[in-house]
């Protein structure tokens, strides 16, 4: 068993112990300051840290530290930020690179070419119309992770919670690495956190693949009202927040977990104007919403458990009244009302602005207001809201203001080294995803509490987190032990082979980053090296060291 597999086993054991020990609403939510100098934190300990990182990783050979490169511009490499504006699009390479970084899981030469050929606006529109993008090549890859595509009934027929969790994580990351629907995948990640369901909660594991497919992926650019109703009826959500057990018959008090989280997290927000009376009214309204059975049942309404409570005698929820509706129809009506609420529009627009523009954005900013208006004008449609944000001057000016979270960083590394898919190594990838992202603190779909993984950079830049990133970069430069032809340094460094170490560094930077290294990164590498930029290039083993250093730089931590 490999180290990665041992770490995956430890993670699964820890997850299983948590299943019965904690309610998803019992754990205190994360809170942290957003005041943070991103570049300073990313650069960390500089050259010493880079050298220590290389020494700490036992799966790659100790690198011969490269130095300041001699400027080169091989014709086989993608254009750099210094390239003049394209005569066809009139857009600078810097903005094309910004779009590729921010709206994908990492730029590749092929992606940069595609964006330049289409123009950024057309490319964004193509990505938002994700169903029209031919991504059939992913079918063969996902076939290696069949549980990610199964129904709860199929999973229950051969129950293996651990394998289901592993395959869901691997399928999620595989789509990020090799999929063509890059913006859709980023939005899937966003909505998976907004409507968070912890896959490690024992009751939800078998239902999460269906929730991922029929709620999150289906509506990622559609109407939020439809997504919210689908989520409220999702067996995964109903079990995660105990709604499946909520009954208000015979004098019983309904469970308030889902009602509270739906108001606070999914719709209007904690400052949305609701109070405890509203929470109780929503809990009564949704009493009887459940599933046919825990193992494989779909949504089922039990009228005998249902009680309209205070809403039956003139109550209201933020201005909504049932007007004679009861049961499922009343619950759906409230959910659609809340999806259309102005507070929900502003909150969703703000969260998406933080995700795609940066933490400096405020809820009262014009860019948020414009996106909220697009959402409202299109009856809660998500795509127009996202488009408003991505075509804004604020988005264009936000280059370098977002850090890659661990999943994004992991996927970007394997996209950077142009790892080729090998079905024979599907299990290895699954173990690697689980072990490495566990170390980095972001296993897909595994955040314990209903608020989803944090979206502020300070959470991801502790000293331990940065060391783990540097170690991951060294592992990634070795493609986690993947043999050729999965990994080929020539694909990254180009042909003919570099003449000097400096030449190799420059080529690696252009291929991985899409632009030259910053002076500060070059200086950090130089300080850990006794070489010069004219040191002759020796063997392909050096390529992994050069690639590792470029992957470790602050530029590669930024979206």
What is the predicted function of each stretch?
Residues 45, 116-119, 128, 142, ...:
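A general structural motif at alpha-helix termini
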Residues 91, 95-102, 110-114, 118-126, ...:
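Extracytoplasmic/secreted proteins, especially bacterial periplasmic and envelope-associated proteins
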Residues 1-36, 47-54:
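N-terminal secretory signal peptides
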Residues 78-92, 97-109, 341, 345, ...:
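Flexible, low-complexity segments enriched for small/polar residues
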Residues 42, 46-50, 204-421, 557:
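Active-site substrate-binding loop specific to GH73 endo-beta-N-acetylglucosaminidase modules
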Residues 109-210, 215-217:
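N-terminal accessory alpha/beta regions
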Residues 61-76:
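Short, low-complexity, disordered segments immediately C-terminal to signal peptides
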